[in-house]
Amino acid sequence: MSYSSLYAWDNLWSAYRKAAKGKRGHQPAATFEHQVADQLVRLQAELQQKIYTPGGYHHFYIHEPKRRKISAAPFRDRVVHHALCNLIEPIFDARFIPDSYANRVGKGTHAAVDRLQAFARQYRYVLRMDIVKHFPSLDHAVLTAEIARVVRDPDLLWLIEQILASGVNVLKDEYAMVYFPGDDLFAINRPRGLPIGNLTSQFWSNVYMNPFDWFVKRELGCSAYLRYVDDFALFS
């Protein structure tokens, strides 16, 4: 897993195709596609020289099933997100528990519901919980430490930090800081939050929650456990 593999032409082309899927009628994708070769060459050079800088987000709200602030990255940044996930997501995915169902190939909502119903038929009790303001509160220091356990290439870590930094404070108005015993000034002021809408945010959410998943399975001994993003259930 090397940084040069990320900006290789084949990977960038694959990333562009994924980013454009279902978006070809939208202006940002159409503008990029009009000069796609030039756009990818420019992006490749920026990544290779490490002068790539993420652009600003376009924000809007959805109201189903509840009000949420969505942050859409510029199209070229979405290409970079796909290029990064093409490279590192399979490595992390192999480390996830089988019963983590969000934003994973072969999983999804229907599979999660099927598994939930199977557990419900098998067990008498269930504890269902969710994480309040999961994306707005997500601690970058905790996330980067977890990523760095697997990703050792300093250039890849540089790119990850660039993408993470671009989303700092995007959701600051959505989250009231919660303090825990032992928190100091450094912990309180650490960067937090992942923009809802980024491919990387969905992936990094699973990376962030993976130690918790394994804690429930191994330390608590709860084999009948499943999670979908920030919602999870334990059966007994």
Predicted regions: what they are:
Residues 5-22, 54-59, 86-91, 121:
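Short, compositionally biased low-complexity segments
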Residues 1-41:
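Non-catalytic, polymerase-adjacent accessory regions of viral genome-replication enzymes
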Residues 39-42, 46-47, 99, 118-229, ...:
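Conserved polymerase palm-domain catalytic core
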Residues 22-30, 55-81, 95-107, 127, ...:
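Short, conserved non-catalytic motifs in the polymerase core
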Residues 15-19, 83, 159-164:
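Short alpha-helical scaffolding segments that buttress acidic/His motifs in well-ordered protein cores
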Residues 37-67:
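Active-site-flanking structural segment that lines cofactor/substrate pockets
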Residues 1, 85-139:
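Active-site-proximal segment of RNA-dependent polymerases
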Residues 78, 82, 86, 90, ...:
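Short, residue-level hotspots on alpha-helical faces of the histone-fold
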